[in-house]
């Protein structure tokens, strides 16, 4: 057996890391409780909920004003409620609205877990075996420009060019270079728009790919790769200015609960990872 990983290569070896940092608390989507009513109105967010006016703590006697302007909303018939009651209604409405993005497949209830964590987790990190499994499945969809396919191809080419040793510095440098132009795995396929993954992890903020082991044998080779990713379960101003988000009440409620100074529910980091073994034998 020829072990490709000879000194000075240190394991784990970073093959790729996004410019975006892990644990970036300074990101705008990680801010909370930093806005007042006027800030929301300036963003066109007068209509938050179909059930309550969260600015005035009024529960509507009938379905909310929809797209009707704030002047009508303010004078709508309703009952004064406490902030706790308003919070309960908003979170229940948020869960119900999430179903339009999460109604099929084994991950359809994942968003409910995230909403619960948003309310009660106090900003702590979120981990889920479901997310790890979904990331594993996503990684192993061998698209033309997928990272795992590029890594395997670089190893194959490197070993074929130097079969006796598999000259590791050239192989690793080739992987690092080609990963720069790869298509990172995200939950943005068509099915993710309704299976619960797109709404649960609407983007991946940071990713890291590391080599854990890499060995060359007389009859083939094997490598173990660690894929680590992090999303922010939070919304920034750019998100809510985007019509793709702001047209849905789900995101307006989310943004309100996070950013209004009187509610200020903390966003959090969603962490997931998978370890993949790739190999080829004669």
Predicted regions and their residues:
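Membrane-inserting hydrophobic helices used for pore formation or membrane fusion
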Residues: 2-198
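Amphipathic, interaction-prone secondary-structure segments
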Residues: 183-219
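Hydrophobic residues positioned within well-ordered beta-strands of beta-sheet architectures
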Residues: 221-225
């Amino acid at each position: 057996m020829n072990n490709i990983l000879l000194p000075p290569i240190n394991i784990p070896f970073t093959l790729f890391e996004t410019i975006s940092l892990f644990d970036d608390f300074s990101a705008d989507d990680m801010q909370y409780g930093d806005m007042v009513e006027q800030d929301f109105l300036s963003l066109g967010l007068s209509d938050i909920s179909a059930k309550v006016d969260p600015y005035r703590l009024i529960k509507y006697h009938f379905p909310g004003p929809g797209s009707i302007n704030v002047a009508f909303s303010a004078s709508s018939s309703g009952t004064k409620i406490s902030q706790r009651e308003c919070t309960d209604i908003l979170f229940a409405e948020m869960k119900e609205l999430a179903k339009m993005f999460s109604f099929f497949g084994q991950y359809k209830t994942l968003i409910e877990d995230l909403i619960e964590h948003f309310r009660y987790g106090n900003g702590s990190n979120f981990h889920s075996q479901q997310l790890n499994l979904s990331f594993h499945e996503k990684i192993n969809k061998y698209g033309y420009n997928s990272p795992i396919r590029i890594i395997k191809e670089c190893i194959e080419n490197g070993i074929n060019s130097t079969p006796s040793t598999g000259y590791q510095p050239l192989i690793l440098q080739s992987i690092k270079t080609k990963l720069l132009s790869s298509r990172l795995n995200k939950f943005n396929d068509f099915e993710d728009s309704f299976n619960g993954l797109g709404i649960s992890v609407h983007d991946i903020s940071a990713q890291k790919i590391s080599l854990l082991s890499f060995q060359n044998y007389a009859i083939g080779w094997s490598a173990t790769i660690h894929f680590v990713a992090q999303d922010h379960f939070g919304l920034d101003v750019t998100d809510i200015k985007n019509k793709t988000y702001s047209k849905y009440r789900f995101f307006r409620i989310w943004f309100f609960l996070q950013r209004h100074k009187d509610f200020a529910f903390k966003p959090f980091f969603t962490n997931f990872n998978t370890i993949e073994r790739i190999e080829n034998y004669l």
